[in-house]
Amino acid sequence: MEYHLRTKLNGNIAMTSCFHENSFLQRDRSLYKFIWVRHGTLDVEVDHVVMHLEKEEMISLTPLHHVQIRGVGGEYLTFLFNSNFYCIYRHDSEVSCNGFLFNGSSRVMRLKLSPSQSARLDSIVDIFRGECGIQDNLQEEMLRIILKRFIITCTRIAREKFDVDPGREN
């Protein structure tokens, strides 16, 4: 699956299951990324450190992270966006581009998803896919809302994993 939207203000949002084959997205150093292994494994190099990700593991990366896919042993999904698409809008601090998932830490946020967490994210991805087929003047805003829902869901999962109280992420 491959979807990419560029807005009039140079905002970008993309979803792909073939990030390792898309040189355009790989070269774009402005993108925030979620990489989610759906089945099998994925070897990813982030800032010269190789990470072996397994089924239902997800990482969130900022534009400052240098990432290369080293080995694909299954199916994965990459959700990407830049600050012109999402971050220029006023968002609550915990779900912003400076929030809990993208707080600039040198450590990569790595999440292991439970079946119920995976199902919640699957439903958001399905909604995103459906919206990709609707070409109208509301699509950009709808995709922004879907992205925010994805980020909020991931933030809740990370809070639970790291036992962080709401509002205490920073």
Residue ranges of model-derived segments:
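Structural motif
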Residues: 41-43, 50, 66, 75, ...
